[in-house]
């Protein structure tokens, strides 16, 4: 393929791009929250209507922040962060944390949560 340096950008045919439709928009957060109906999780809705869900052993946390997550002492807001999922590790294996924007489709978060819950086992 020859490159024409005189032309800025690139050119291609629409067929070559193989355009797709992608899931967009926040969706319904209850698709995520409803997965925690069993008694092994605590639910808290705070005064900002943020939802906090945790496992009774304290190792799993899910936070839903429809208007963005509030920041720490040095920051006003962590803008755009709508979902936080964290699993605390052990003395041997580290845990993990992930966050998603306020406009991440709830269906995608629900899929991630379902996978995490499927891997957890009572001791």
Segments (PLM) and residue ranges:
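Intrinsically disordered, low-complexity regulatory regions enriched in serine/threonine/proline
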Residues: 2-4, 93-123
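Negatively charged, low-complexity tracts enriched in Asp/Glu with abundant Ser/Thr
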Residues: 2-59
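Weak global preference for isoleucine
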Residues: 33, 44, 53, 85, ...
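Generic detector of ordered, mature protein regions
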Residues: 45, 49, 54, 64-66, ...
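Intrinsically disordered, low-complexity regulatory segments enriched in Ser/Thr/Pro
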Residues: 60-107
């Amino acid at each position: 393929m020859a490159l024409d340096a005189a032309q800025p950008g690139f050119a291609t045919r629409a067929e070559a791009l193989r355009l797709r439709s992608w899931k967009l928009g926040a969706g319904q957060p209850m698709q995520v929250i409803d997965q925690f109906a069993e008694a092994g999780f605590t639910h808290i809705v705070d005064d900002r209507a943020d939802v906090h869900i945790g496992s009774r052993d304290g190792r799993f946390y899910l936070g839903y922040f429809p208007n963005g997550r509030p920041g720490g002492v040095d920051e006003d807001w962590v803008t755009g962060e709508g979902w936080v999922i964290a699993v605390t590790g052990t003395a041997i294996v580290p845990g993990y944390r992930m966050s998603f924007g306020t406009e991440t489709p709830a269906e995608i978060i629900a899929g991630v949560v379902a996978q995490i819950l499927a891997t957890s086992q009572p001791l």
